[in-house]
From Swiss-Prot:
Residues 1-28 form a transit peptide. It is found in: Mitochondrion matrix. The keyword Metal-binding applies. One of its GO terms (cellular component) is mitochondrial matrix. Keywords: 2Fe-2S, Iron, Iron-sulfur, Metal-binding, Mitochondrion, Redox-active center, Transit peptide. Residues 33-138 form the Glutaredoxin domain. This is Monothiol glutaredoxin-5, mitochondrial. It comes from Lachancea kluyveri (Yeast).
Length: 143
């Protein structure tokens, strides 16, 4: 009539303290989320960085800009956003991508990663292929 009682149930304490999972993201405001989505859609290659391409304000942003330049990214297909100008943007992009650091690179609306990932992809040739597939490189002159 009564089923067997699991020994695990007997050994388990009646009260278990559960810690809620901690997430990097809080609820983004609708306006911030829409602004980030709009920025990501503004060009095939989008970089959220500290400073500007002409005047990067951190070594990682500078290294990422230099790598994109070495890869031959077409300036007409590139957009950069200075997160130092807007605290909501700075925190929002981290939450949006669930990536804790800046710079953050997007190609064709897909999050690629930060400086370390971009550098690794450049070394393996993956970045060149990704940018070529996105048609984001300066076209080669026909001779």
């Amino acid at each position: 009539m009564f089923g067997r009682i699991s020994t695990r149930a007997l050994l388990r304490p009646a009260f278990t303290h559960r810690i809620p999972s901690v997430s990097l993201s809080r609820f983004l405001s609708t306006e911030t989320k829409q602004a980030i989505e709009s920025a990501i859609e503004s060009a095939p290659v989008v970089l959220f960085m500290k400073g500007t391409p002409e005047f990067p304000q951190c070594g990682f942003s500078k290294a990422t800009i230099n790598m994109l330049g070495q890869q031959g990214v077409d300036p007409m297909k590139f957009a950069a956003y200075n997160v130092l100008e807007d605290a909501e943007l700075r925190e929002g992009v981290k939450e949006f991508s669930e990536w804790p650091t800046i710079p953050q690179l997007y190609v064709n609306k897909e999050f690629v990663g930060g400086c370390d990932i971009v550098m690794n992809m450049a070394q393996t040739g993956e970045l060149a292929k990704l940018l070529e597939d996105a048609d984001a490189l300066v076209p080669e002159e026909e001779e």
